[in-house]
């Protein structure tokens, strides 16, 4: 009895010690589900960032081709008028003008007009003045040759040929007149044979010459005024 009581008292005096709790581990299914969700979220974020980058690149490529609308509102014909305004803006920039000077447009079938140097411009101006003076000279010469004033369409070659023939006729007439005057002054020719020469002058000039036939005792040469009155159109 005493031993049993001692055992009970000894058992009552000793209290049971608590055992340490093991850490809680999630199941394998929950772990894999969490990893899959994290991977899906990362993939979605990467896809969204890639899409945003692609949209930004497209906007940057389309920005030079689109016309900015006035006050932030696009007009009805924005797509048609956008290239025109962009072209105007580009052509007004000095950088583009310098690039156009360096480009070669011969392959497209046209070329940009180039400014002439000052020396070339002066040479062209002198050539134009020379041609103008030549034309004025021919117009003046055409007025002095026979039938030149009536025929205004006479070419330059015809005008020169007519002037040469006219000068030769005048020179021949002057030579004949000087020879006859010298012969009469020297006494080689007598007044009796002078009517033949007067008839020749009458046939050429178409006007009578009385100084050789009216008076047989004296001879009066032609004066310069009478010489100018001779008509030389019969030579042509």
UniProtKB/Swiss-Prot annotation:
Changing residue 127 to K: Found in two unrelated individuals with short-segment Hirschsprung disease, dysautonomia, increased lower limb reflexes and neurodevelopmental issues; likely pathogenic. Residues 118-170 form the bHLH domain. It is found in: Nucleus. Gene3D superfamilies: Helix-loop-helix DNA-binding domain. GO terms for molecular function: bHLH transcription factor binding; chromatin binding; DNA-binding transcription factor activity; DNA-binding transcription factor activity, RNA polymerase II-specific; DNA-binding transcription repressor activity, RNA polymerase II-specific; E-box binding; identical protein binding; nucleic acid binding. Its main location: nucleus. It is linked to Genetic variations in ASCL1 may play a role in disorders of the neurocristopathy spectrum manifesting with features of Hirschsprung disease, congenital central hypoventilation syndrome, dysautonomia, in addition to neurodevelopmental issues. This is Achaete-scute homolog 1. It comes from Homo sapiens. The gene is ASCL1.
């Amino acid at each position: 009895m005493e031993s049993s009581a001692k055992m009970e008292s000894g058992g009552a005096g000793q209290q049971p010690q608590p055992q340490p709790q093991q850490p809680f581990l999630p199941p394998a299914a929950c772990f894999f589900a969490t990893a899959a969700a994290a991977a899906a979220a990362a993939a979605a974020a990467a896809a969204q960032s890639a899409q945003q980058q692609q949209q930004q690149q497209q906007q940057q490529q389309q920005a030079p081709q689109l016309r900015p609308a006035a006050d932030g509102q696009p007009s009805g014909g924005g797509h048609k008028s956008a290239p025109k305004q962009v072209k105007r803006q580009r052509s007004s920039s000095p950088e583009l003008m310098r690039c156009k000077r360096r480009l070669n447009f011969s392959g497209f079938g046209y070329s940009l007009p180039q400014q002439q140097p000052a020396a070339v411009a002066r040479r062209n101006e002198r050539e134009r003045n020379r041609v103008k003076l030549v034309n004025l000279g021919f117009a003046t010469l055409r007025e002095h040759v026979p039938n030149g004033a009536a025929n205004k369409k006479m070419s330059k070659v015809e005008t020169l040929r007519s002037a040469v023939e006219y000068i030769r006729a005048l020179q021949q007439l002057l030579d004949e007149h000087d020879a006859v005057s010298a012969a009469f002054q020297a006494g080689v020719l007598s007044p009796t044979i002078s009517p033949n020469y007067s008839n020749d002058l009458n046939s050429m000039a178409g006007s009578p010459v009385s100084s050789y036939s009216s008076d047989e005792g004296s001879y009066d040469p032609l004066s310069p005024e009478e010489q100018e009155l001779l008509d030389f159109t019969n030579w042509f």
